[in-house]
Regions:
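Short, surface-exposed, polar/charged, turn-prone segments marking secondary-structure boundaries
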Residues: 37-40, 62, 103-105, 129
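Interdomain hinge/lid region at the active-site interface
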Residues: 47-115
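Contiguous C-terminal substrate-recognition/catalytic subdomains in enzyme active sites
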Residues: 92, 102, 108-138
Length: 138
């Protein structure tokens, strides 16, 4: 059944699962919820009709943020230790980007952008193409 929908069954310990998915799934959902909330707060604070001008990025994040809130609350609470560590790492990296932007550190920010772009290439090479129904596995 799992293979029929394009998935692969991988056995791993609960601890390993929770650590991996805290970064690959749980943190991205948390970021999506927070980005949409930030847009909502910005809209109220600045009195701009921000949502009307939502670009592809915000629209993509809002799709994730529209996920089932009860399920995600439970995931966040049940994997709080690993998610908290993932948040700390994210904040550290976000602050590093902020520092580079504020200091106009061209070399550092370009290195970050190039290195993170390589992750997308690796994902595609693993045949995880999100634009295909089976993630490009066939």
């Amino acid at each position: 059944m799992i293979e029929k929908i394009g998935s692969k069954l991988v056995e791993m310990s609960i601890d390993k699962h929770d650590k991996i998915f805290s970064i690959t799934s749980h943190l991205p959902h948390l970021i999506a919820y927070n980005l949409v909330k930030s847009a909502q707060d910005f809209e109220k604070q600045e009195k701009y009709d921000l949502i009307k001008y939502s670009a592809g990025g915000l629209r993509d994040f809002s799709r994730i943020a529209a996920s089932n809130e009860i399920m995600w609350r439970d995931i966040f609470f049940n994997n709080k230790k690993n998610i908290s560590k993932a948040i700390e790492l994210f904040i550290k990296n976000l602050n590093s980007f902020k520092k580079d932007i504020n200091s106009k550190n061209n070399k550092s920010i370009l290195n970050k952008l190039i290195n993170t772009k390589k992750v997308r290439t690796k994902i595609i090479k693993l045949k995880q193409d999100i634009n295909k129904p089976d993630f490009g596995r066939n």
